[in-house]
Amino acid sequence: MSCGHVVSRSVRDSALMLDCTHGAAPGDPYAAPAPARPFADEVGADPDKLRIAVMNHGHDGEPLSAECSRAVSDTAKLLTDLGHTVEAADPGIDTMAVGRANRAIIAANTANMVRNRAKALGREPSGQDVEAATWAMVQLGNAVAGPDYADAVLQIHLLSRKLGAFFQDYALILSPPLRTPPLPLGTLNTQD
């Protein structure tokens, strides 16, 4: 899985690239609103006082490791000391439903990309063309029925609306990306 943009050395570099690349192309189905001022101007600027939601548990409601919980608590204290309003709040997202919807959408799109690439090469796609994990995703994507894909998109849109309502009250959510510290590099093998 990946996230599209740039690899940079600093937030300032990323902000400059966002200034160069933000905005929708004609015909894009979705577009973020234009920023009020350049992203680069935001780097180092003092933010207004923010209302921040804190989730000191996993997104699935499970407890965090002591190390992750301490990091969230320490960061919440720092933000409070900086004058922000920090309070426990959870948008109440069904992470299992979101996971199923994401998996269906990502798998179907992965299958489509691999199929289109193989078509451009004039042959059928095979597991020899991609990593084992990608091929497994292709197989899963080929099994996603049209109505299931449509429902997955609907679920993501409902999630988006729910989060949109939540962010009417909060500027951001402080939460750990994982319940435990990340696995060491090399632990996961996408070839098997």
Role assignments for model-derived ranges:
Residues 82:
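Conserved dinucleotide-binding and phosphotransfer motif residues
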Residues 63-64, 98, 183-186:
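Short glycine-/acidic-enriched loop or helix-start segments at secondary-structure transitions
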Residues 1-75, 93, 116, 124:
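A short helix-breaking turn/cap at a secondary-structure junction
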Residues 13-16, 71-74, 78, 151-158, ...:
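A non-catalytic, amphipathic alpha-helix used as a structural packing/dimerization or gating element
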Residues 41-56, 105-164, 177-189:
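Short helix-loop capping/hinge segments that flank enzyme active sites or metal/cofactor-binding pockets
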Residues 85-90:
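General small-molecule cofactor/ligand-binding pocket signal
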